[in-house]
Amino acid sequence: MSLINGLLALLGEIESDAIAVHEERCISVRNRNADCLRCVEACTSGALAYRAGELLVEPERCIGCGTCATACPTCAIELRNPTDAELTAQLKHSIVATKGHPVIVCEQALEAANVAADDASAACAVPCLGRMDESALVGLAAYRAFDATLACGSCETCPHAPGGALVREVVEGARNLLEAFGSSMPIDLEECVPERVLEPGGSHGQAGSDGVGRRDFFRSAKDASTRAAGAAVAEELGMVEAEPVPAAHRKVGADGTLSQFVPTRRVRLYNYLQHVGQPTADEVETRVIGAVSIDAQKCSSCRMCAVFCPTGAIKKLDEGGVFGIVHRPSACMQCRLCEHICPEQ
């Protein structure tokens, strides 16, 4: 089975109640010369694997940790349980419950501390910290948290070790983004559950001081601001977030490019940064925003980069007698598809 056929089969098999798959966003599906397997490399449970040149998928092993979705630069994989909006509601609850000092804790850390999730109801509990992406952490600053703590187990010996490696990269990127926008909010990664989120005697899911049970709160909480803010930032980027396109109906646009989209996480990230402050730096080192460097002497103007770019960060330019491309770093996800498919390298 070819890599592309393997990817299509893989994406189809992992779709579940926990995970939504938008195969038209996958850069390896968009162009067979791409070599991205970030979701496979990040999988913490062995549900996705690449061995002996073959892609393997075992859906029953998926724990719904979301690390594959965090690793995917184009949001080809999205979490359904919880969704990003539901996770945001949990984070906002932790901000309120801890009086501005939210805690995100993984299941391994809770197990190591012999603490049930309901006995740490002030924290946001996730299967693995690899679930957290930069927009979620930057959002804590936008919601006026004083600091943020991510509590993990021993990631080196954890069966979900890839998630521990990824969250460290995410934390570093989030710190850099906040610093670039004038925020000094600390983001700490600790191998213990902070005492401030533990309930004396254990509540075992009983209602808190606000009279709302933790699970009922998470089930009913909505994040309406995300939709309004998302529309505003998407309009500023000159694009509207695309609805998933069924493979059978996927078409090339009038200008010869594949369908393009702005993932909700990118829109949410920019909205949060606008609330955090104004840029204080010209450059920032992070895995989620990039800038393409083009050697004009080598470029043959084939514009394949614009044809396959998933977000429109590189677009065709045909106006005023000018023939070429235009690059918008604000939409670049660092998927590196343009780099891999450029015939001139």
Where are these regions (language model features)?
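N-terminal secretory signal peptides
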Residues: 164-212
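Ferredoxin-type iron-sulfur electron-transfer modules and their immediate structural context
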Residues: 1-42, 46, 99-112, 192, ...
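Glycine-rich phosphate/pyrophosphate-binding loops
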Residues: 141-157
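Structural alpha-beta junctions
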Residues: 118-127, 142-147, 172-186
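Extended interfacial segments that mediate partner engagement and assembly in macromolecular machines
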Residues: 75, 83, 87, 92-139
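Iron-sulfur cluster-binding cysteine motifs and their immediate structural context
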Residues: 32-58, 67-85, 304-321, 337-345
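Short, flexible/disordered intra-domain loops and linkers
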Residues: 156-165
